Amino acid sequence: MAGFFRNAPRDVGSFVLIVAAVGFGSGFAGGQAVAAAGGPFLAHQALYELSLVKSRGSNSINGARGRILYNFSGSACEGYTSEFRQVSELDSGEGKVTLSDLRSTSWEDGAGKSYRFKIDTRMNDAESSPVDGVAERAGDHINVKLKQPVSKTFTLDGTTVFPTEQIQRIIAAAREGKTVLELTVYDGSDNGEKIYNTLSVIGQPIPGDRTIAAPDPSTSSGVMKSLTRWPVTVSYYDRDAKAKDGEQTPVYAMSFELYENGVSRALVLDYNDFVISGAMGKFDVKDSKPCK
């Protein structure tokens, strides 16, 4: 899901990653990522309850609440489908409350060569802001065709990855004992033209039998109990922004515990001026067809 949280406002504008943020991965070109990650991703539905952890800076807020509903399904054979909805309410004080409703659907093929996405954002009573497009790998570059918000075609460097591949590579790096991973990511967020440089910091593995201080539906699931997970923090940087004094501040950072089957728990979303937690409130495993 990591890709769909990126529209979250630092100025209490449109709230949402991603994925997403919380992002959930897929294979990259040639199917190497699937083998590297050591197993298929789990088809599932997860509900996250959002709440304000702390507020700071000039654009601080008084309160925040909301929910994220995330559905993930598919396989390396048929591709991966993600459905995401986030409804959030931000209170910036003096009676100013911003209500946002973001819905997105995406499909990414198992080889990481094709990515289709539709994103719709509504703010208060304003009209929706749809983004609709497709990205296809072609040799050493990626061709992007947008239908909305405007009809447009442009190219990206071939080293850029899509959201599912991003998570797949993080899992592969974690299995190899790596602690840092840099990737350039495209997920169609914002106006469909934004590209992000990401820095993932991976902590030590957490075995499935370790006692959990704050359990949730994923940790009590029989499917999940024996699985290893890793604490991960992914920072997203605007590729077009200029660094100040040699350093660049991330647009936002997302921390979470990432299971080896792609499920994420214990979300913490840091938007610089405020921090929001996403506690898993519900978790359901979905039926899926094995890859033949």
Predicted regions and their residues:
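Bacterial N-terminal signal peptides that target proteins for export
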Residues: A2-L17, S26-G27
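C-terminal segment of classical bacterial N-terminal signal peptides
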Residues: V22-Q32
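N-terminal cleavable signal peptides for secretion/export
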Residues: G31-G79, E83-V97, C291
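A short, structured loop/turn motif at beta-sheet edges
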Residues: A37-A43, N71-Y80, W107-K113, V223-L227, ...
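Short beta-strand segments that buttress and anchor functional surface loops
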Residues: Y48-V53, F84-E89, F117-R122, V232-A241
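Hydrophobic/aromatic beta-strand elements that line small-molecule binding cavities or substrate pockets
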Residues: G66-S73, D101-E108, G133-A135, M254-E257
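Hydrophobic/aromatic-rich structural module bridging two neighboring secondary-structure elements via a short loop
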Residues: F84-R137
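Mature, soluble, non-transmembrane domains
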Residues: D120-K292
